Amino acid sequence: MSSFLDILGDGHVNFEKCGDVVVSPKDNMVAMFCHFCKDIFTHLPEFMRHLQWSHSDVLQFTKEQNVYRVEELMSLETSEDDVQSQANSCSSGDSGLAGEMEDADGEPGSSECLANNLEIMNALAAFDVDVDGLNNVSHEQSYSKTPPDSRTEGFRCARKPGRVEKPPSICDLKSYNITRHSRKREAIKQRLSSVKKRIMRSLENDVISPRLNKLRSKLNNSLSSNISGPPKQSKMPSLLENSSVNELPAVLESTNPPNFDSEQPYVVSTTIKPSIRPCPSRTAVKTDRNISHQPVARRSTVNIERVDILPPINIKQKMKMSAKDIPFWESIIISSVASQQPSELNTTNNAVDQPPKRPERRSSLTVISSSPIQAMKPMRRSSMTRENTSPESSGILRSGEVESPAKANKRTKDSFEETSSSNEKGNAKRSKLEQNRCSMNFSLSASVTEYIRSDLKTSKLDLDSILRLAEPLESDYFKNTIVEDQVKNATKMGSPQKEFTKLQIGVKPEMEALKEDLRLLKTVGLLVLKDSCFEDKLPFEQSESFRKTAAKFSKIYHTYDTIWSYRKTKTIGVHQRLTEQLNSFTEEVNREIDCHLTTNEIKRILNLINSWYAYQIDQRFFRKATLSYSVEHYMFLFHFLPKINPTVYFCECCEEIFPNEARYKKHVQSVHAVHAFTCSECGKSFKRLYFYEKHLKTVHLKP
């Protein structure tokens, strides 16, 4: 090959066009087109052999040329690329050494590359090719660029095969995942912010519902009469009549409040609410009818013209006050209640159906809401023996006529005199109240009367109707005695009620069952199952004896795992073998503890132990309760019992077993308990009459 290069440099080489390269992008193929025979070859070695064998006369080959495959020439280069890719994959990918490693690789035609391929070296040795000379030429070409020959300047050089793209490294994949998650978080934040803006916009532009507007209009209509304004013409005469001449100037004065006595307690309350009026200096807002304005809740300015303060009230003097000296505020309450129409009184009964309103401050003249006493007034002295209410007590509520102030004052005076009576009169009144079952069981004292008086400032009831509730009526007493006599006579003659035969219930009373359980538990030393603090009531020697007995019983119980393990009990499968185990366990317990217990009593003890142990496990591990020292000691004796898995409950009347306490109790209640209703034909018991009658109709076909 060195001689060929020398000839090429001397210019003695004849360049002959042998063929063209044909490319088919559709089929993804490259072929060589022979210029002499017009034939196409898909492989380069095949094309070279064709030229040597078929067109040697034209090309004038002096001897046979050796032709190598491209795969053989490129095998070493591909192996080096694989080694380089492995080195790059082992590195972090961010060190920046890939370019240096590519520059450090030798050229495919160098001596270092050819020396690794044995076949190429043998072929070169057959033709006496100098490898070192080739290496020097390659180095000279790498360091100094040879000027192109004028004869070969128009030809293109062979291209080096391009490198395959490297797969992404681990760091590249991690960075890609991080950026993808960050983009997702940003998208979620934008979506949430848009939803938040939409919610805030809907809250700002929310229109008040028609139901709320209706409630607000009702509230405004109810309060329109209470807001300050000119008083009604119908109530003014009654106010002027009831008020005395000396007290009117004190009420009409707006700036000079009355002098209060510092030694006596006093109560201050407003008689008139602050008047809410539009400001005169403010101009009215003009609105266009064609534009629909949305209602906006704003606070209007309050213009308070005057505030009147009531004079102080002396409780001792008011209790003994005569009818002529009734204070002005009491006459206002009486007149306002008397002037109410029946329609207005009936509206208070519907107050329960209305939605709750905002509580407002009470005033001495305004009626804001109905009192709970008023709602209970129609239910006064409700009893089965009473048929009609007395006309005296219900006349005030039913009649709409205005009562004269003199009669009202007289009735109020009588009620106050009765409350301040002597002890003998109070005892007689108390005995009279006890005889009447329908009346109240207490008498009103002066403090209670004053409290009721202050609490009824805003209600639509007067004080007299409340005081009459505590007084027994003679007519009611006679009516009650007559009805009681009729009931006694009816019971003596015999009522048409259904009489059912009373059967003795097989289940023992609770006290007897508890005594029986205590006796059984005392025998085996397990009183802690019923009383967790029983050791505190006993001396030390006796408590130690109980602990020793319980330890013996638990040791024997531990050996019979087929009794306390539900899984092993089910594997036995035959009730006879389980009965044999219980009998042997009973005999061993009687022999070790020196007692005389039956098999049913042993079953009862085991059921009590399982129920108590399950309850203590629930308290300790699930409810995190602190157990006493004695309870923990006895729990340790039965540590082998299952804590979560099902345990064994034995029926004391039959041979059935159950995995939990609920099924055991249901079985006893439905099968072995004798109830009040028992079928005479089949002997089945029923807890309720409905099921007994249904059983008779469906099973025995009885009407």
Swiss-Prot record:
Chief location category: nucleus
A single cellular component GO annotation: autosome
Biased composition, class Basic and acidic residues, residue ranges: 148-161
Gene Ontology MF term list: zinc ion binding
Any one Gene Ontology BP term: male meiosis chromosome separation
Residues in C2H2-type zinc fingers: 32-55, 649-672, 677-700
Compositionally biased spans, kind Polar residues: 84-94, 138-147, 339-352, 364-373
Keyword annotations: Cell cycle, Chromosome, Chromosome partition, Meiosis, Metal-binding, Nucleus, Repeat, Zinc, Zinc-finger
Region (Disordered) residue spans: 78-111, 138-161, 339-434
Cell location: Nucleus; Chromosome
Miscellaneous comment as given in the Swiss-Prot or TrEMBL entry: Drosophilid specific gene duplication generates rgr and tef. Teflon has a function unique to Drosophilids.
Free-text function comment from the UniProt entry: Specifically required in males for proper segregation of autosomal bivalents at meiosis I. Expression is required in the male germ line prior to spermatocyte stage S4. May have a role as a bridging molecule maintaining adhesion to hold autosome bivalents together via heterochromatic connections.
Family membership: Belongs to the Teflon family.
Name recorded for this polypeptide: Protein teflon
